[in-house]
UniProtKB/Swiss-Prot annotation:
Keywords, comma-separated and alphabetical: ATP synthesis, ATP-binding, Cell inner membrane, Cell membrane, CF(1), Hydrogen ion transport, Ion transport, Membrane, Nucleotide-binding, Translocase, Transport
The keyword Membrane belongs to this UniProt entry's keyword annotation: yes
Keyword Cell membrane: yes
HAMAP family cross-referenced by the UniProt entry: ATP_synth_beta_bact
Binding site for ATP: 155-162
Protein name per Swiss-Prot or TrEMBL: ATP synthase subunit beta
GN (gene name): atpD
Protein task: Produces ATP from ADP in the presence of a proton gradient across the membrane. The catalytic sites are hosted primarily by the beta subunits.
NCBIfam families: atpD (TIGR01039)
Superkingdom of source: Bacteria
Enzyme class, spelled out: translocase
EC number: 7.1.2.2
Length: 469
């Protein structure tokens, strides 16, 4: 047996124990097994997770372990799992070990990076807070993203999480000339498939790299896929000096797969059965998502909240890292207002006059006050009707309804379905429009003119056309 070869001594589901004669692979080192199942040649990658004493290691499999038997030969790589990086990854789909899985020509990478890397040091990190303009009115105005910040995207099924993700990818590609990386962490294969074809249809595929570790895969693949995607994003930030968007769907599944791995490795669980190292593992991933003096990684993370319990250890460990939250609300979607972002529930750390400027802060808080007042008046309106309100309250209700309509916006990636051309609205135009509504400049314009348009100029044109027709 060669020095770097070992043999399998035990297989427990996705956990494999391997014994080496003279060599001891390091923690996180990759091991390769080539074997045959029913006449089909297969290869499997393992990652060393624990040393068991002697020259024995416990490793986590990155794919199904069916067909493995004791005494099979295992080869140590002498290095970690490495994945392709660079512009050649754009428009392709990868699995956790960096193999292309889109049935196209296999990628022969010219450059690979290990998936476990150090977070940027204090000296490398950028301390200035800069707003990241998305071109989506409701986000830029009420819950702005910061460059290199982390955003939580909360929402149930079918309220438009994927459409917002695609629109952000589109706007980053076309307005900021940047790239995006999408990591599908433990979600449905069907959703990954849909996303790929929707992106192809929406024309954004050539600006994004997709990494999938789906629900049906072992916990090792579901956990490490987040690092695979992040490594690709880090290359664009560190080597190309770009501002990259990183999407993780779903960050809860990262914690969940970590819990499964922890139990399989024999660690004693902590609260609610999660791994004792939950906070540390979450920090290891989140700390790598940062702004440096070269570029930035801004991440949007979909967060599944089990049983709607925000105190569950997994979502609670995510909250500590988030700079902004974008909450999608089914009631808003039912009104036909898309994007269905809740203007009162969504938050942002940078929504303060020091960070975004006095004018933006004033307009944003003014809008929130009007919407909150409208929400408070809903019960009275339901019982007594609009006529019983004071003149001032009637004005508030009128403006609030216009604001609600004006927070809707046609998306580029939804053009195929809606038939109305997408709009990118600059922050300047957004502030001008909403500031004008608050000042009462547009009180004479009917509320339907505010629905599904971009800037306030379009509202005026739409109102003019409505009047003429």
């Amino acid at each position: 047996m060669k020095a770097m070869e070992g043999k399998i001594i035990q297989v427990l589901g996705p956990v494999v124990d391997v014994e080496f004669e003279s060599y001891l692979p390091a923690i996180f080192e990759a091991l390769d097994i080539n074997f045959e199942v029913n006449g089909v040649q297969k290869s499997l990658v393992l990652e060393v997770a624990a040393h068991l004493g002697g020259n024995r290691v416990r490793a986590i499999a990155m794919d199904m372990t069916e067909g493995l038997v004791r005494n099979q030969v295992v080869k140590a790589r002498g290095k970690m799992i490495e994945v392709p990086v660079g512009e050649e990854v754009l428009g392709r789909i990868f699995n956790v070990v960096g193999e292309s899985i889109d049935n196209l020509e296999p990628l022969k990478p010219s450059l690979t990076w290990p998936i476990h890397r150090k977070a940027p040091s204090f000296e490398q990190q950028s301390t200035k807070t800069e707003m990241f303009e998305t071109g989506i009115k409701v986000i830029d105005l009420l819950a702005p993203y910061s460059k290199g910040g982390k955003v939580g995207l909360f929402g149930g099924a079918g309220v438009g999480k994927t459409v917002i993700i695609m629109e952000l990818i589109h706007n980053v590609a076309y307005k900021h000339n940047g790239y995006s990386v999408f990591a599908g962490v433990g979600e449905r294969t069907r959703e990954g498939n849909d996303l790929y074809f929707e992106m192809k249809e929406g024309g954004v595929l050539d600006k994004v790299a997709l990494c999938y570790g789906q629900m049906n895969e072992p916990p090792g693949a579901r956990n490490r896929i987040a690092f695979t995607g992040l490594t690709m994003a880090e290359y664009f930030r560190d080597e190309k000096g770009l501002d990259v968007l990183m999407f993780i769907d779903n960050i809860f599944r990262y914690a969940q797969s970590g819990a499964e791995m922890s139990a399989l490795l024999g660690r004693i669980p902590s609260a609610v059965g999660y791994q004792p190292t939950l906070a540390g593992e979450m920090g290891k991933l989140q700390e790598r998502i940062a702004s440096t003096k070269n570029g930035s990684i801004t991440s949007v993370q979909a967060v599944y909240v089990p049983a709607d319990d925000l105190t569950d250890p997994a979502p609670a460990s995510v909250f500590a890292h988030l700079d902004a939250t974008t909450v999608l609300n089914r009631k808003i979607a039912e009104k036909g207002i898309y994007p269905a972002v809740d203007p009162l529930d969504s938050t942002s750390r940078i929504l303060s006059p020091q960070m975004i400027g006095e004018k933006h802060y004033e307009v944003a808080t003014g809008i929130q006050q009007v919407l909150q007042k409208y929400k408070d008046l809903q019960d009275i309106i339901a019982i007594l009707g609009l006529d019983e309100l004071s003149e001032e309250d009637k004005k508030t209700v009128e403006r609030a309804r216009k604001i609600e309509k004006f927070l809707s916006q046609p998306f580029f990636v939804a053009e195929v379905f809606t038939g109305s051309p997408g709009k990118y609205v600059t922050l300047q135009e957004t502030l001008e429009g909403f500031g004008g509504i608050l000042e009462g400049k547009y009180d004479h314009i009917p509320e339907n003119a505010f629905y599904m348009v971009g800037s306030i100029q379009e509202v005026l044109e739409k109102a003019k056309n409505m009047k003429n027709s």
